[in-house]
Amino acid sequence: MKMIMNIRQRLNKNYNELNGLYHEISMKLGLSDSKSMVMYMLYDIQEPLTQSDIVKATGLSKQTLNSAIRKLEKEGIIILEKLNEKSKKIVMTDKGQVLIEQKMKPLVDMEDRVLASWTEEDRRKYLELIEKFKVQFEKEVKAYDKRK
């Protein structure tokens, strides 16, 4: 059990330090973490998203996300288009596409260089294990809900 605890601690330490690095690059890009996450997703996925898509993918609270979206909208980076009665899709403006490209491409390029420096086997293994951890942890979270 001590070995599992050490692995969990190392995992959490690396996860937290990685989050710190994303925060650091967001600051260097002149962005809040939440604006950076929204812009990153729009850049990476290259299609309109809903607020619920972003909440689900990032874990941001609805309030934090809404605040970031309002700021991006006010700055002319995005517009909200009605999707249905309950949802609006977040769409990049022309100005937003240029700005998001300028801000997010350097970050994505950094990630790509790191991944390109790994062997194909390391990339495959990393994805396999992180996906396996996520799936099993998701089951644990759902099981916890049932115990309450």
Name every feature range the model reports, one short phrase each.
Residues 20-64:
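N-terminal helix-turn-helix DNA-binding core of bacterial DNA-binding proteins
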Residues 7, 34-35, 50, 95, ...:
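N-terminal positioning helix adjacent to the helix-turn-helix/winged-helix DNA-binding module
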Residues 70-128:
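Charged, amphipathic alpha-helical coiled-coil/dimerization segments
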Residues 11, 39-42, 130:
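Hydrophobic structural patches
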Residues 1, 121-148:
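C-terminal regulatory/oligomerization modules of transcriptional regulators
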Residues 11-14, 18-22, 99, 103-118, ...:
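Alpha-helical linker/hinge and terminal dimerization helices associated
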Residues 1-29:
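N-terminal leader segment of winged-helix/HTH proteins
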